[in-house]
Amino acid sequence: SDGVKGILYASQISSGEENNLNIRVFGTQGSLQWFQENPNELIFKKADAPQQVYRRGNGYVGAAAQGATRTPFAHPEGFIEAFANIYRGAATAIADQIAGRKAPKGGYDFPNIDDGVAGMAFIQSAVKSGKAGAKWVKFPRT
């Protein structure tokens, strides 16, 4: 959000693709890539070095990633567990509220009302763009 510009390409009906959700971020010094069909890996490609593949469940991942991992590395984990992480975060927030505990530094790791409002604004902007012939439309910041 420091004035960096990007492009979002999204399609729910790409011919020949079954699901293939992927996120790729490209910068001047390298890129990050994640593919839902291979969800346990994050690929880091530096412009001047061989690519690095980070796999979930290993000791080199951060504390947040370790906390969201339920099975040892090389064992499958994925879609259903992602929802379990959201529910666990919500349950922790409720338990903390009941016990009078403060939220952890950085807040809780689950979507809140602001995330929901931003998601709805995105959907409305996508519909508006579609009705305008796939033209760029202003995305309201919430």
What are these regions (language model features)?
Residues 128-142:
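C-terminal capping/lid region of NAD(P)-dependent oxidoreductase domains
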Residues 17, 33, 119:
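Short catalytic/ligand-binding loop motif for oxyanion handling, primarily in non-cytosolic enzymes
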Residues 117-130:
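C-terminal hydrophobic helical "lid"/dimerization subdomain
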